Amino acid sequence: MTNIRKTHPLLKIVNNAFIDLPAPSNISSWWNFGSLLGICLILQILTGLFLAMHYTADTTTAFSSVTHICRDVNYGWIIRYMHANGASMFFICLFMHVGRGLYYGSYTYMETWNIGVILLFATMATAFMGYVLPWGQMSFWGATVITNLLSAIPYIGTNLVEWIWGGFSVDKATLTRFFAFHFIFPFIIAALAMVHLLFLHETGSNNPTGISSDTDKIPFHPYYTIKDILGALLLVLALMTLVLFSPDLLGDPDNYTPANPLNTPPHIKPEWYFLFAYAILRSIPNKLGGVLALVLSILILVLMPFLHTSKQRSMMFRPISQCLFWILVADLLTLTWIGGQPVEHPYIIIGQLASIMYFLLILVLMPMASTIENNLLKW
């Protein structure tokens, strides 16, 4: 009799996705981040659910309800910090996952890639709304500043902002709707992740060489299940080290002050994972221009398949492109650093140069390097 996992309608789907899936024999640890992102998402949904049981989405009690979770709820402190730092781990895995895609040319699977970009936007939106919920100073002013950016949209901008706020400023209505959206979005992300996987399994995984691996496949289980479990253990180790030793390392001290609309913090800044985009936003002195640059800094990923001029898919055998890729990584780290600094000399000019460099590398230098490498191969 055929094994039940191959005949049962539900188990068959699981089997074809995680057990008998033919996978390339040479995918490295850079291919672990997909499963790690899945684990992060499950962890965030579970910790978030338990937090939602004790949280109140009201301006008068939101801050004290978070304090209550940390002080009075059984293991509330660990759930809260796992959720807050889990978001950081989520974004670390996301950036690594996208970086892997850029380096090894995974963006040539266009459907998978575009769903991935939508997933990135959805995750960023979710994290932003989640940051508003504790209703500390940085929550309130972060929400005010970021939502206000939409007022740069010509003609409908102001109406749009007031519609999102549910009033004439960030207030009770804003907090309530942000909580509602923050709760529903992870489930939308989970659904999109399923579609992401569906499209990936239409083509099969890429591999470090960028060459077709159809002639050399191995079953996903046990090889990559074991590998993913190791990755998961390392992820949990890193997360719990952060949670138990320095839970506030990546947070902002200002968020331990209750939100006060009458007192603006000296330096308004988002969480660390948004700082690179925030630096690009601030580097343009025009409001609309800044907002466009902010959106384009991530939307530019959609253009990657069209900017690919190389005859090879992966950067594995392309030293010039490799060099430019790591310059891009360094540039993004520079932007992250600048985003957290005050708007003064020399940070302004460094931010502007790093922003120009970012777009120049992706739009001009990397496609040029690929063309040069193509010509070098002719010799």
From Swiss-Prot:
Cellular component annotations (GO), alphabetically ordered: mitochondrial inner membrane; respiratory chain complex III
Mode of membrane association: Multi-pass membrane protein
Cofactor: heme b
A single MF term (Gene Ontology): ubiquinol-cytochrome-c reductase activity
Residue positions binding heme b b562: H83, H182
Keyword Transport: yes
Transmembrane regions: 33-53, 77-98, 113-133, 178-198, 226-246, 288-308, 320-340, 347-367
GO biological process, alphabetically ordered: mitochondrial electron transport, ubiquinol to cytochrome c
Residue positions binding heme b b566: H97, H196
Keyword Chaperone annotated: no
Subcellular location per the Swiss-Prot or TrEMBL entry: Mitochondrion inner membrane
Cofactor, free-text remark: Binds 2 heme b groups non-covalently.
Binding positions for a ubiquinone per the UniProt entry: H201
Assembly description: The cytochrome bc1 complex contains 11 subunits: 3 respiratory subunits (MT-CYB, CYC1 and UQCRFS1), 2 core proteins (UQCRC1 and UQCRC2) and 6 low-molecular weight proteins (UQCRH/QCR6, UQCRB/QCR7, UQCRQ/QCR8, UQCR10/QCR9, UQCR11/QCR10 and a cleavage product of UQCRFS1). This cytochrome bc1 complex then forms a dimer.
Note: Heme 1 (or BL or b562) is low-potential and absorbs at about 562 nm, and heme 2 (or BH or b566) is high-potential and absorbs at about 566 nm.
Family named by the database record: Belongs to the cytochrome b family.
Task performed by this protein: Component of the ubiquinol-cytochrome c reductase complex (complex III or cytochrome b-c1 complex) that is part of the mitochondrial respiratory chain. The b-c1 complex mediates electron transfer from ubiquinol to cytochrome c. Contributes to the generation of a proton gradient across the mitochondrial membrane that is then used for ATP synthesis.
Name assigned to this protein: Cytochrome b
